[in-house]
């Protein structure tokens, strides 16, 4: 008889149970290590300020408290500073007649938004603030932002209220007359990040890159202490 088979047959029930328990423990240990590795892989990578800047994100040394304001949401309802509470908001200033920068930015923001996991998307808002309130009425803004993503939101309102809000976020915009009698609007291309306390927290420089935005956004969220 083969020696190995003979040795196996000679093992007592207690020895066989011991071997089985050892195998089970080793398998469970391997599964635990694998689960820990996969969980770590899913965690955001914390990066330095220098890395943030190299990837297009500038985090304010101290988040800026915003003055109270009231704008008009694309739903037609009033929108106040309090609406930012409890959520992360990425705010871009643009307008529906913008020929290139705005649609490109909105499409990029949609690509970025789609890369986020479901839990992160749940408390992340993408908001377009109009710099052309004369033409961007709520219903028009509503259709425009939802063309890019049904979860996106739009804000418009009185010109001076929009201007004050933009100034607080260091986003310039100016009406520019055209030769044909019409006008366009020059505006900043950065995307501003407002934290769950409703404070100006950071901004993303143009040109935007969805992968870099995801990296920096997740790091900023992970280091936010409220």
Give the label of every model feature segment.
Residues 51-87:
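Short extracytoplasmic
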Residues 103-113, 138, 142, 159, ...:
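Extracytoplasmic/secreted envelope proteins and their assembly/folding machinery
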Residues 87-88, 105-128:
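Conserved helix-turn-beta segment immediately C-terminal to the redox Cys motif
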Residues 142-188:
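Short, internal strand/loop/helix patches
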Residues 79-105, 109:
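Short active-site neighborhood of thiol/selenol oxidoreductases, capturing the structured segment around
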Residues 121-136, 151-160:
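Thiol-based oxidoreductase modules, predominantly thioredoxin-like and allied folds used
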Residues 179-226:
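Thiol-/selenol-based redox modules, centered on thioredoxin-like
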Residues 1-66, 224-226:
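N-terminal targeting signals for export/organelle localization
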């Amino acid at each position: 008889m083969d020696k190995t088979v003979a040795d196996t047959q000679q093992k007592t029930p207690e020895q066989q149970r011991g071997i089985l328990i050892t195998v089970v423990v080793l398998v469970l240990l391997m599964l635990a290590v694998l689960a820990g590795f996969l969980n770590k892989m899913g965690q955001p990578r914390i990066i330095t300020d220098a890395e943030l800047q190299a990837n297009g994100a500038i985090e304010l040394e101290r988040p800026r408290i915003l003055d109270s304001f009231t704008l008009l949401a694309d739903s037609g309802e009033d929108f106040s500073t309090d609406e930012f509470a409890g959520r992360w908001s990425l705010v871009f200033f643009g307008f529906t007649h913008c020929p290139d920068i705005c649609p490109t930015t909105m499409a990029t923001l949609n690509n970025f938004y789609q890369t986020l996991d479901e839990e992160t998307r749940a408390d992340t808002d993408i908001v377009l603030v109009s710099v052309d309130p004369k033409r961007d009425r709520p219903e028009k803004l509503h259709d425009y932002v939802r063309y890019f993503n049904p979860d996106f939101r739009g804000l418009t309102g009185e010109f001076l209220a929009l201007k004050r809000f933009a100034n607080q976020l260091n986003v310039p915009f100016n009406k520019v007359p055209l030769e044909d009698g019409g006008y366009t609007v020059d505006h900043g291309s950065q995307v501003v990040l407002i934290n769950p306390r409703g404070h100006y927290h950071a901004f993303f420089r143009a040109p935007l890159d969805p992968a870099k935005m995801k990296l920096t956004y997740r790091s900023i969220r992970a280091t936010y202490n409220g």
